[in-house]
């Protein structure tokens, strides 16, 4: 997982990720995005247990699941631009849980990650 402190609460985000320029690297393919008001890894990992040897269940307590993104690009230096993601409530911390990588490895590599605060305008 990857945790980002935005420094202040935001109501909507979008992000841009760039894969590394190395062909053998494993990028994120499927991720769950969670948000929280505070950074508390002990709460996040509350209830960790081994299942089937290597698989780990994580409770994600204290966070709110916002979305699941699938089919992220797997090419060398390939760029992904997310849509605007409205958050369920203003939040300061983003938790990117990588559930699948492009090469099926238990680790991932990113070249760059940019996160943008967005404003939502409702037209009447």
Ranges and model annotations:
Residues 1-47, 79-123:
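Aromatic, loop-rich ligand-recognition surfaces of beta-strand-rich domains
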Residues 46-86:
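Extracellular carbohydrate recognition and processing domains
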């Amino acid at each position: 997982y990857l945790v980002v402190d935005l420094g202040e609460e935001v109501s909507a985000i979008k992000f841009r990720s760039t894969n590394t320029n190395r062909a053998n690297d494993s990028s994120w393919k499927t991720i769950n995005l969670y948000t929280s008001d505070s950074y508390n890894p002990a709460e996040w990992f509350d209830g960790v247990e081994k299942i089937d040897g290597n698989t780990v269940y994580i409770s994600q307590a204290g966070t709110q699941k916002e979305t699941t993104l699938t089919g992220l690009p797997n090419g060398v230096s390939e760029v992904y631009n997310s849509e605007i993601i409205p958050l369920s409530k203003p939040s300061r911390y983003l938790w990117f849980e990588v559930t699948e990588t492009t090469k099926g490895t238990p680790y991932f590599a990113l070249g760059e990650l940019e996160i943008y605060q967005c404003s939502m305008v409702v037209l009447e």
